Amino acid sequence: MFFKKVKKADLEAVSSRNADQERQENKMMRAWISFGVVIILLILLFFASINIGSLKVGFGELLSGLFVKYNKDVATIYDLRFPRIIISMLAGAAIAVSGVLFQAVLKNPLADPGIIGISSGASFTAVIITAFAPTLYFFTPIAAFAGGVVAFFMVYCLSWKGGLSPMRIILTGVAVNSLFTGLSSALNSMSGGDRTGVAAIVEANITQKTWDDVTTLLPYVVAGLFLAMLFTQECNLLSLEDKTARSLGVNVNVTRIVISLVAVLLASISTAVAGAISFLGLIVPHIGRILVGSNHKMLIPFSAFFGAFT
């Protein structure tokens, strides 16, 4: 009788392990399918966006005009539409991954570069350069990054009270966001510089963007996404209690600051070039967790693709 009970318990344990393994395999399958669908949709969106407007070309004509023989219509699309499409995709990817990193660092599911004031801080310093020193346009991304860092540490310090409270972070972030948004509006009204450039930053308008803006944005976004992928394991560990993370060998404070700087870089640079984009960094990570899970090794690259699509 005793051996029958032991055998039954062993069979139940094996059955439970098999069920868990099957669930994990199903999750991984769903994650890879989600990756494939988003990548396909992103490619389709890219080619569909090329033909949005009065000027339209076929796919074969586009390839021929790009690589074989000069075509006036294709050249126009290449000069005008390609930069806007690429900038919107790069900025979307950067903002989405920035949201993932902020939510991991702050342990707050509502953390978003726009909500907690990072985008408005970056926008403010970018507006200063654009409005009063347009000849220093090359330094706009650096100025935006500095503004984003200042905004982040304002939120971090003002919301700290024996620890980080999600509610205090959001309330402080809203206040910092309002402060920098008001300052940007004031600078816009009193500046004598490039009003169009200032409006483009504040309103996220990419209609005037060129290949120069692409070359400005691309290296920063690629570097930021590469750094984000280097910290996937740390992001997973930061989701644990700080004591647990420290016991696993993580220097919590230093790791939190470094990952925050990567998130600020992504959000600030995209804001400087494409303008302030709200809620993308909030929504995309949550959709990503539903589709691919909470493991940042999957969540970060998926959010980049889905943010570019969105």
Language-model features: where?
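Alpha-helical transmembrane segments in inner-membrane proteins
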Residues: 2-310
